[in-house]
Amino acid sequence: MSSSLTIFFFFFASTFLYTSSNSFNITNILNEHDDFSNFNQLLSETQLASTINKRQTITVLVVSNGALSSLSGQPTSVIKKILSLHIVLDYYDQKKLKNLSKKTVLLTTLFQSSGLARGQQGFLNATVMKNGDVAFGSAVPGSSLDAQLQDTVAALPFNISVLHISSAIMIDVKGDNAPTASPLSPVSSPPRPAESPNDDGQDFDEPPSSAPGAAADEPSENAGSANGVSRNDSQPAFAFTLLMSFIWWFMARLR
């Protein structure tokens, strides 16, 4: 076996091991939390779960079963747009959000990248309130910050962060032309009112050219073990086994 072929194989195996070790599955993550079973089911039904799993860096804002009443009776096309607004195209954990330098940030979501958003519909406003809590709301002018950050569901810096918020963030997407489907079963619990923010400035999270631009805050330095993240553990194990088998075979050929 030539040395160039050996180097190529080791490079390929190392890359595969690195990629596999950072993989995640949002369905498996939420399967560990019964209170998010409805949200988890909707992600699968709208095929957003597979989209999330293909991303290398993502933040998912999840809503408990008792706080999904605002999505009751909505067609699948509307639900998909609303849920995609809860998928942020960057990594944000609690520490990063609570330490925003300007106390507020504009977040780019999957809905914005779909090309279906109108105006500021594809962006979220995250703001640190006077009491230190973090609240979310649509970036559409006149929208309130109704969704409060509750806690962390899972985190794998800097690949995926799953955060529990108090209510779904709603925008008006019913006027869009899209196919409809059967409505959902009703759920209960209205959203909470929001507090007034303590800072009027905005710090933007890399929005496209159509939105006002500014730099986002740097990721928080809390890398380490994933809190509650369910990884695709079989892939790294298989890759490691494959690599070790090749090394054993290669060493045997050298004898």
UniProtKB/Swiss-Prot annotation:
Comp. bias (Acidic residues): 197-206
Keywords on record: Cell membrane, Glycoprotein, GPI-anchor, Lipoprotein, Membrane, Proteoglycan, Signal
Keyword Nucleotide-binding found: no
Lipid-conjugated positions (GPI-anchor amidated serine): 225
Membrane topology: Lipid-anchor; GPI-anchor
Polar residues biased stretches: 222-231
Predominant place of localization: membrane
Pfam family, one: Fasciclin
Domain FAS1: 24-169
SUPFAM superfamilies, per the entry: FAS1 domain
Subcellular location: Cell membrane
GO cellular component: plasma membrane; side of membrane
Residues spanning the signal sequence: 1-23
Propeptide feature ranges: 226-255
Glycosylation sites: 25, 99, 125, 159
Ranges where the record places region Disordered: 179-231
Name of the protein described by the UniProt record: Fasciclin-like arabinogalactan protein 14
InterPro entries from the UniProt entry: FAS1_dom_sf, FAS1_domain, Plant_FLA
Recorded family membership: Belongs to the fasciclin-like AGP family.
Keyword field contains RNA-binding: no
Protein function: May be a cell surface adhesion protein.
